[in-house]
């Protein structure tokens, strides 16, 4: 005991010495006096533990407490006119009261979504509802000290969506159907329009957005500059021509039907967007990304992703919120930024990227962990820069992949990124499925199904004619048209923005929303049926094989891609 007393006494003496520079004389005398008298039994005030607490109280005052903060406060935000005071309703999950009420009434039936609800757990989750019925989930609770916070709701939602996506993929794979359908249907089942296992979608959709980023990054790794030059004219000029034709057709139709011209132009721009994620996922499953029709389709899809920013700049003009001149200036600025971004990316491709990858290979001689992390970081940095410049995350991630594809480490990088891509791609496709309201589709299945058939026929015909104009054979043209026949997931964002700007009316909004959702569900089945139909003997003379084109230049294009694939 004497040895432990000496050790404790020495520790406290050293602590007192370190505090002497900031402590007054009276505190030191009281501190050391208590240490000397600490051996007196029964003296609670003079115990070492009590003294240690008083020293800590003196050292760390209330003003020194580092409170957890998000960098803003209520008073300062209102004073700086960064926020406005508004009445909200706070929804708390009081477990005791709720259980007592249920036991007394005995009327609340069991609901399956309660199994996945966090309301029965000792959770501090809080929900706020404003006067416009907007729902907000608290993400950063004020705390006296900085603590590690865990969002149990997000963890639960991710577990649900990943498990159901896996089940859906397994079931449809066993049935010989595309797993994309399984992902989409799994999302629709667990989403707000289904069994409501997931009701707060913002956080899940944000995490799932990485699926598109990594999907296009991996696509860029396979989509080399040589292939880009082969399909460049049809991708850029053909993609632009397809958008213009749809906008013109819908605009004329709107005028003939007595609707507003701006509404018709928006519908045409809306319908021109195709789903990059769904199409690319299908091409990857069929190992068709290197085929000629796959390259043409991917080129047009990438061009559409570039045009998304221009369409957002066009919406205020169509809504009458800004003049035509202002809209033209906004589009011109975006084109200038895009040119600068691509120029800088080209310079980095030949100067920085090869040296960077060689360094990562040297540092990753023992394990690929550092190389994998560096590749993901490079992809995310490029996507983030593109988004900050007013372009899109998708364009930035694709450009990052193309930059790395010019090096000898492209295949190695693809192997490292593929597992991450597959996980987040399934997560993203399932999150798209959560936007699909099964009850809404079923209640209006007749008009929505007719709309989907009309959209598929029109988009397939226009895309096939455009590709055929660039002297591709009928099989390739029709195949590309079918692949581009659906409406893309970015149409949901475009549609929401147009509704806020009053470009379209409520009924048209619901029609386009349901048509988009149903087209995404039926597209994978269409992908599976149409190619099989084209291989029927009676149709072979209308749809010859890709390599049987009578045009010599097309044969050179196909052979160039094949040679490049063998040497890559």
Swiss-Prot record:
Induction and repression of expression: Up-regulated by osmotic stress.
Stretches for region Disordered: 59-78
Effects seen without this gene: No visible phenotype. The triple mutant kea4 kea5 kea6 is compromised in cell wall biosynthesis and has a reduced growth, small rosettes and short seedlings, and is sensitive to low potassium K(+) availability and to high salinity (e.g. K(+), NaCl and LiCl); it also exhibits a reduced luminal pH in the Golgi, trans-Golgi network, prevacuolar compartment and vacuole. These phenotypes are partially suppressed by the cell wall-derived pectin homogalacturonan trigalacturonic GalA(3) in the dark but not in light conditions.
Residue ranges crossing the lipid bilayer per the database entry: 154-174, 178-198, 201-221, 230-250, 264-284, 298-318, 334-354, 389-409, 422-442, 447-467, 476-496, 510-530
Tissue/organ expression: Expressed in roots, stems, leaves, flowers and silique.
The entry's keywords: Antiport, Golgi apparatus, Ion transport, Membrane, Potassium, Potassium transport, Signal, Transmembrane, Transmembrane helix, Transport
GO MF annotation, one: potassium:proton antiporter activity
Subcellular compartments: Golgi apparatus membrane; Golgi apparatus, trans-Golgi network membrane; Prevacuolar compartment membrane; Endomembrane system
Reaction equations catalysed: K(+)(in) + H(+)(out) = K(+)(out) + H(+)(in)
pH dependence: Optimum pH is 5.8.
Main location: Golgi
Signal peptide: 1-20
Membrane topology recorded in Swiss-Prot or TrEMBL: Multi-pass membrane protein
Primary role: Electroneutral K(+)/H(+) efflux antiporter involved in K(+) homeostasis and osmotic adjustment. Together with KEA4 and KEA6, promotes growth and development, and facilitates endosomal pH and ions homeostasis, as well as salt tolerance (e.g. K(+), NaCl and LiCl), probably by supporting cell wall biosynthesis during rapid etiolated seedling growth.
PANTHER family assigned to the protein according to its UniProt record, in alphabetical order: K(+) EFFLUX ANTIPORTER 5 (PTHR16254:SF20), POTASSIUM/PROTON ANTIPORTER-RELATED (PTHR16254)
Name of protein: K(+) efflux antiporter 5
């Amino acid at each position: 005991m004497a040895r432990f007393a000496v050790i404790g006494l020495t520790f406290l003496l050293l602590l007192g010495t370190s505090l002497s520079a900031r402590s007054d004389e009276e505190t030191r005398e009281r501190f050391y006096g208590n240490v000397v008298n600490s051996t007196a039994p029964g003296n609670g005030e003079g115990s070492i533990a009590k003294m240690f607490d008083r020293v800590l109280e003196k050292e760390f005052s209330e003003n020194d407490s580092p409170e957890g903060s998000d960098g803003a406060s209520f008073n300062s935000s209102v004073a700086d006119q960064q926020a406005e005071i508004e009445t909200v309703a706070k929804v708390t999950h009081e477990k005791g009261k709720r259980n007592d009420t249920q036991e007394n009434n005995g009327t609340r039936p069991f609901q399956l979504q309660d199994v996945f609800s966090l309301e029965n757990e000792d959770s501090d989750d809080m929900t706020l509802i404003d006067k416009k019925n907007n729902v907000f989930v608290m993400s950063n609770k004020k705390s006296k000290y900085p603590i590690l916070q865990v969002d149990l709701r997000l963890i639960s939602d991710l577990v649900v969506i990943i498990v159901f996506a896996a089940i859906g993929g397994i079931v449809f794979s066993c049935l010989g159907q595309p797993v994309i359908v399984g992902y989409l249907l799994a999302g629709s089942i667990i989403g707000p329009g289904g069994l409501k296992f997931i009701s707060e979608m913002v956080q899940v959709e944000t995490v799932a957005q990485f699926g598109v980023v990594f999907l296009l990054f991996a696509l860029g790794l396979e989509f080399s500059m040589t292939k880009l030059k082969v399909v460049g004219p049809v991708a850029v000029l053909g993609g632009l021509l397809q958008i213009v034709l749809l906008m013109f057709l819908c605009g004329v139709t709107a005028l003939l039907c007595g609707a507003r011209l701006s509404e018709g132009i928006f519908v045409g721009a809306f319908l021109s967007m195709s789903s990059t994620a769904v199409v690319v996922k299908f091409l990857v499953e069929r190992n068709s990304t290197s085929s000629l029709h796959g390259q043409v389709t991917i080129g047009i899809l990438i061009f559409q992703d570039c045009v998304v920013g221009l369409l957002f700049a066009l919406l205020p003009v169509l809504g009458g919120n800004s003049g035509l001149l202002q809209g033209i200036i906004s589009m011109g600025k975006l084109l200038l930024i895009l040119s600068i971004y691509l120029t800088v990316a080209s310079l980095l491709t030949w100067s920085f990227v090869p040296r960077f990858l060689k360094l990562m290979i040297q540092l990753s001689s023992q394990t690929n962990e550092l190389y994998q992390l560096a590749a993901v970081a490079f992809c995310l940095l490029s996507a983030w820069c593109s988004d900050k410049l007013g372009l899109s995350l998708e364009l930035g991630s694709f450009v990052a992949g193309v930059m790395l594809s010019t090096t000898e480490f492209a295949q190695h990088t693809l192997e490292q990124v593929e597992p991450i891509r597959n996980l987040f791609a399934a997560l993203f496709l399932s999150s798209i499925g959560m936007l699909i309201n099964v009850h809404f589709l079923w209640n209006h299945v007749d008009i929505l199904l007719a709309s989907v058939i009309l959209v598929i026929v029109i988009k397939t015909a226009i895309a096939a004619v455009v590709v055929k104009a660039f002297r591709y054979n009928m099989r390739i043209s029709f195949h590309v048209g079918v692949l581009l026949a659906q409406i893309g997931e970015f149409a949901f964002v475009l549609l929401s923005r147009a509704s806020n700007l009053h470009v379209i009316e409520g009924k048209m909004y619901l029609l386009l929303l349901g048509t988009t959702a149903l087209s995404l569900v039926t597209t994978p089945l269409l992908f599976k049926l149409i190619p099989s139909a084209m291989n029927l003997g009676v149709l072979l003379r209308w749809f010859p094989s890709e390599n049987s084109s009578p045009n010599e230049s097309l044969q050179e294009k196909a052979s160039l891609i094949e040679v490049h694939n063998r040497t890559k």
